[in-house]
């Protein structure tokens, strides 16, 4: 559906603001993050944009700008934080009557950038906004219709996506709760990959050093290639499953009207017979 946006990540963080929509009226925004006793920072973004960069010894910060078509709307765009146990909940609030970035000629949004020390986990709750995460130890992303890109995540990435897009590169392990009508692309997974359900969207995995398990594929597509372990799939409905270059075994338990294509399987192949 969407092409990968990872080449954009190689640009400076400020480039994210250069590509922003119109910004007739603006104000700076910042928040001094209180990380005392915190293991995870939860960013509740809604329709806003965020870049998170984690590195050793980094000073925690959150800054950016609020943009609006009406100057009076700027006061409705605020940042808040609240501690709950060992989590810090950071919210990009929009106390306005329209929910999206644009409604006709009206718009209101924030573009934000955060730095975190590299021992703090990151959790994202994204509506129609977009987020990029680089260097976090563990990442969790719940995405609606927005976009998330992440790279250099040392540990587990847990993700779910509705109609949006998730693009991952160089991660420790992968757990996908569900893919609705959107896309999830993962490259260079250094551990096991577990996928729950794929609806009408697409799942692409290119390079995995562990085992891969997909529970179910509906009318969507799954493409898996270059896996050092085993690949097992519970069921395929009317969608397509393409498996190439697997050093271990391939197993498909149930297949409906969809298609299965496989090649380069070193181990055993156990799939339903064609009727």
Task: Enumerate the predicted regions with their spans.
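Sec-dependent N-terminal signal peptides
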Residues: 4-14
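Intrinsically disordered, low-complexity segments enriched in Gly and acidic/Ser/Thr residues
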Residues: 207-208, 213-216, 221-235, 242-245
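Short cationic/low-complexity microdomains
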Residues: 238-255
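Acidic (Asp/Glu) and glycine-rich low-complexity loops/linkers
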Residues: 18-126, 132-143, 149-161, 165-178, ...
């Amino acid at each position: 559906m969407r092409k990968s946006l990872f080449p954009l990540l190689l640009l400076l963080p400020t480039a994210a603001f250069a590509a922003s929509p119109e910004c007739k009226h603006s104000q700076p925004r910042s928040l001094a993050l209180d990380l005392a006793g915190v293991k995870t920072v939860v960013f509740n973004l809604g329709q806003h944009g965020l870049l998170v960069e984690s590195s050793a010894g980094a000073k925690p910060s959150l800054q950016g700008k609020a943009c609006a078509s009406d100057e009076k709307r700027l006061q409705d765009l605020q940042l808040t934080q609240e501690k709950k146990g060992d989590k810090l909940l950071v919210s990009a609030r929009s106390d306005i009557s329209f929910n999206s970035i644009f409604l006709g000629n009206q718009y209101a949004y924030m573009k934000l950038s955060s730095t975190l020390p590299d021992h703090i986990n990151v959790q994202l709750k994204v509506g129609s906004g977009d987020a990029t995460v680089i260097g976090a130890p563990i990442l969790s992303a719940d995405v609606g219709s927005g976009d998330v890109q992440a790279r250099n995540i040392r540990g587990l990435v847990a993700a779910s996506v509705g109609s949006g897009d998730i693009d991952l590169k160089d991660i420790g392990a992968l757990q996908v709760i569900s893919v609705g009508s959107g896309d999830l692309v993962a490259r260079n997974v250094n551990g096991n990959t577990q996928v729950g359900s794929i609806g009408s969207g697409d799942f692409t995995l290119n390079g995995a050093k562990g085992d891969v398990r997909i529970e179910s594929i509906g009318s969507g597509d799954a493409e898996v290639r270059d896996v050092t372990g085993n690949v097992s799939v519970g069921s395929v409905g009317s969608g397509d499953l393409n498996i190439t270059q697997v050093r271990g075994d391939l197993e498909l338990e149930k297949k409906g009207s969809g298609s299965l294509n496989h090649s380069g399987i070193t181990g055993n192949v156990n799939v339903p017979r064609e009727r």
